């Protein structure tokens, strides 16, 4: 799960495994595998960084 900021400035928590694609048009649009779309303030690169950080965190054995 990653925490992002919706365009309404409220926190949105998204399951990163369910992300199908990320587009910038000019705001960032995240499309999930089920077709739901989320507009967020973070850039695509920031979203990717959050996904990588989350995956590193869940693969770190000290959290198990």
Located regions from the model:
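Eukaryotic intrinsically disordered, low-complexity regulatory linkers and tails enriched in Ser/Thr/Pro
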Residues: 1-13, 17-64
């Amino acid at each position: 799960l990653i925490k992002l900021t919706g365009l309404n400035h409220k926190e949105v928590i998204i399951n990163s495994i369910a992300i199908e694609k990320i587009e910038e048009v000019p705001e960032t649009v995240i499309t999930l595998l089920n077709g739901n779309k989320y507009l967020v303030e973070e850039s695509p690169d920031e979203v990717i960084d959050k996904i990588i950080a989350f995956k590193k965190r869940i693969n770190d054995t000290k959290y198990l």
